[in-house]
């Protein structure tokens, strides 16, 4: 059935300034908040198996759209100096900063925390969103001594620690902010009515200066399914290993 849920909020602002001495600058900011019930880029059979769900895959909950950065800032500047009618030098800079260099603990632009195994009994493993326990009494572990490690894992993660006592959202997690700076020097040379160009491009220039800059952090795949379904107890409750 068609659904009337879902939303897409996009805000963009841009400033441009051209100076008379050959300098052009631009600064732009974009904010995106998009939610849907289905990851629309998949065919039906693949979508049923791969989309993280909170229970019934036939009635998917509203969740964050998989693609697109939540926030993005870009800035550019170019300067041109004309040495003569046939020779000029152009220096350009492109800077990008974004949140959500994109991950449902399962991959894509956003991430979701999912169980290892088929918890909801739909015949597909690895697509069930986890419940984030607040205490040891809210989860059955094969080894009860693993609670201390699981509790510490939850505490160190910004998303998990904030959503204790809840089922994780589909695509609820984002990668950390990242920055990137690219530089280009372009030399234009005119000889005998012909124009030649020689360019020097330095990608991720910040990382050339400091190896801690210009690094994009992504989720560790091993951490995307922290809980694995081991068995079911006599009460029909799932038992997990961590």
Residues covered by each model-derived region:
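Short, solvent-exposed micro-motifs at the edges of structured domains
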Residues: 1-242
């Amino acid at each position: 059935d068609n659904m009337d849920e879902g939303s897409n909020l996009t805000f963009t602002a841009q400033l441009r300034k051209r100076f008379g001495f050959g300098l052009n600058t631009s600064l732009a900011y974009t904010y995106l908040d998009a939610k849907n019930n289905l990851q629309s880029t998949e065919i039906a059979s693949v979508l049923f198996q791969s989309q993280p769900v909170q229970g019934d895959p036939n009635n998917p909950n509203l969740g964050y759209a998989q693609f697109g950065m939540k926030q993005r800032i870009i800035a550019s500047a170019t300067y041109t100096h004309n040495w003569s009618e046939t020779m000029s030098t152009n220096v350009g800079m492109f800077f990008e900063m974004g949140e959500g260099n994109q991950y449902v603990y399962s991959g894509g632009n956003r991430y979701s925390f999912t169980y290892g195994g088929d918890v909801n009994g739909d015949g597909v493993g690895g697509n069930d969103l986890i419940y984030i326990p607040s205490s040891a009494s809210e989860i059955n572990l094969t080894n009860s001594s693993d609670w201390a490690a699981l509790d510490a894992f939850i505490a160190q993660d910004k998303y998990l620690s904030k959503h204790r006592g809840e089922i994780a959202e589909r695509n609820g997690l984002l990668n950390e902010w990242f920055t990137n700076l690219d530089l280009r020097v372009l030399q234009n040379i005119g000889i005998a009515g012909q124009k030649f160009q020689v360019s020097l491009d330095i990608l991720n220039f910040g990382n050339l200066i400091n190896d801690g800059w210009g690094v994009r952090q992504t989720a560790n795949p091993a951490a995307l399914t922290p809980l694995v379904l081991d068995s079911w107890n006599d009460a029909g409750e799932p038992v997990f290993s961590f």
